[in-house]
Each structure stands twice: as structure tokens, then as C-alpha cells.
Amino acid sequence: MLLLSGIGPRADLEKLNISVVLDNKFVGKGMADNPMNSIFIPAKGPVVQSLIQTVGITELGVYIEASSGFGQSNDSIQCHHGLVSAEIGQLSTIPPKERTPEAIQAYIGRKKDIPHEAFKGGFILEKIADPFSKGQISLINTNADDNPSITFNYFKHPHDLRRCVNGIRLIAELVQSEHFKNSAQCDQLTTERILNWSVSANVNFVPKHTNDTKSVEQFCKDTVITIWHYHGGCLVGRVVDPDYKVLGVQKLRIVDGSLFRDSPGTNPQATVLMMGRYMGLKILRDRLGEAVVI
């Protein structure tokens, strides 16, 4: 919205013949998304359908979460199977020029080809906390109804890739532990097969390298998807001041996830809602006085 309104990097605005209201090179920059990678775990028997309820916070800089019981019918697999169900949400995993309608249709086709048995168990995922890799948002045209181009540059920073590798290795240790013996059989050989299986089962837009799971780094790159915690682009001190007022203009604030340098660990919607309420009350009290009670 700022870019379309003429607030942003001058060169980017002038390229689309947008009148420059304020030249700020930081608008749309410094964006990030917490990359997520998951390993699908086949169960020996039926499992209870369960969304993520517990988060394991490790010293490795990754969060470990789990979900189970998705895909109780063929239709549910093709149309909805948990965190990997949104076609558009995965477009950020490929370069902007490759984000075509044909790519989306190919993605949908791959979803339909996934075996029903793949979703009789569940999955364990790891996501990177506070990613170092940064991206940006840029306009494709001046039509407000069209999506902009967003690139997060997953794993561009080597520290993020190292953390993903450590997280996947930790999950592999978990599924080979005594605790999984009654529900899933995941010895070393089986775990390698599950990793290969997970490469195909993770339905993103990234070209796959199956049978290459000895390279955990490649597994991370092949199976990365969004967990919808993207943030940044209007950072405090660069685009807005500590009261979230846009620097260089009057009577304009931003209160959303674009302010975050780091996204809260789980469900950032709650934090955004809290910020909205806080700023709403602050504005009312600034106008009407501290005695305002809401």
C-alpha cells in the first residue's frame, strides 16, 4: 500500500511511473519468513486427528511441532491436508518469473497424485526461529488488485541452512527412539526411505531431488514451505517511528506484521491483534484524554 501510494524507493516507484511522495529505500525491504520443513511419519494403525498443540523449543534455533490424522479420505487429501494445503502460499518458494498459472496447476496435480496412505499417520516439522535470510516485496504493476512480487530467499544465509539440517537430524533421532516403536517403525533404513518419501510428499513448487536424502542440506531446500509467519518490510526505525508513525509524512501509522524484525514463535495473529487494540486505545486517549475507559 505504501509503494502504491508513492512511499518507497524512488527508483522502484519511478520505474512504474508512480509519483514519489517520499523516497525511503527501506520500504518493502528486510522481509523474512520462517522456513518450515516436515517429515511424514507413517503410522502402524489409525491415529487421532490432531492439530499442533505443543511446541518443542530447542537450543538449536529451531522449533519442533507435530500434527496427525490428516487425510481420512481421498478427497480430503486432494483438497485439504493441513499446513501444506494452500497453493498460493507456496509461490514464494520459487523465483518470481516462475510463478505462473501453469505452475499452480502443476502443484495441484502433484497433490492429487500423493498416495492416500501418506496421510494416515502425521508429520513432524521443524521451523527456523528468527531467520537470518532476508527478502523483499516489489510491485509488478500499479493495479492494487494484483499481487506484488515477494521473495524471502529461504536458506540464503548459511546459518539458516545449518539450523534446518540440525532440526531434521533431531527429528530423525526422535522417530528412531523408543517412544515411536509402538506407533511407527523408523529404523535407520526406514528413516532414509521416509525422507525420500517426504521429498515427494511435500507439495511445494521447488524442483525435487529424490533419492538424495544423504544430503540433508538438499532435503531442506527441496521441502521448504511457508508456515505463514512472514514479517518485515516496514521496520521500526527505518519506515516507522516507535509509535508506528510513518517517518517523513503526517497522520499515517502502520500496525501489522510488517513491523516485526522477528515473528513471535507461534500464532503471530494474537500479537498483531494486541498491537491493534493497544494503538487504538492510545490514539483515543491522545485525542480524548487519559480518562477514557474502554
Where are these regions (language model features)?
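Mid-to-C-terminal "cap/lid" subdomains and adjacent gly/pro-rich loops that border
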Residues: L2-A129, N141, P158, R162, ...
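A conserved FAD-binding loop/helix module that cradles the flavin
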Residues: D262-L281
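Short FAD-binding loop at a beta-strand-to-alpha-helix junction that anchors the flavin cofactor
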Residues: G248-P264
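FAD-binding beta-loop-beta segment adjacent to the flavin cofactor pocket
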Residues: E126-S138, C234-R253
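Glycine- and Gly-Pro-enriched alpha-helical subdomains that act as flexible
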Residues: N147-P148
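Short, small-residue-rich loop/turn micro-motifs
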Residues: N141-N143, G257-S258
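Conserved, non-catalytic sequence blocks in retroelement Pol enzymes and Pol-derived host proteins
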Residues: F155-R163, G265-A270
